[in-house]
């Protein structure tokens, strides 16, 4: 899973295998060991979009129905997009399935 942060924007990209695992009920995790403070993002499928935090972990839930609908229209350049209201203001959340999934292009 690839994570990209910008001000008020979070973009997640997963490969085909990760997308299949997420839809099957697995939790996708990415972590970073900052000096003195580790950070972890867990992505799961659920009933509705929501974000929860606990210590160093952020858990992001995406609606299973939206993930299933996205699967029917792959390959698709546009993924899922949500606006999540946070205490600091709205967050633009984007979820995409990597169409190339690590394959190299011929030169």
PLM feature spans:
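A low-complexity, Ser/Thr/Gly/Pro-enriched, surface-exposed linker/loop concept
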Residues: 26-47
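C-terminal charged interaction modules
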Residues: 78-107
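Short, ordered beta-strand-loop transition motifs
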Residues: 4-7, 44-57, 86-87
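Mid-chain, well-packed structural core segment of small domains
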Residues: 48-81
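Extended Gly/Ser/Thr-rich low-complexity repeat segments
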Residues: 20-33, 68-86
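Surface loops and adjacent helix of pleckstrin homology
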Residues: 15-17, 24-25, 63-65, 72, ...
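Short, structured motif recognition centered on aromatic/hydrophobic residues
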Residues: 3-5, 10-14, 58-62
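Ser/Thr- (and often Asn-) enriched beta-sheet segments in non-cytosolic proteins
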Residues: 40-42, 50, 59-61, 92-94
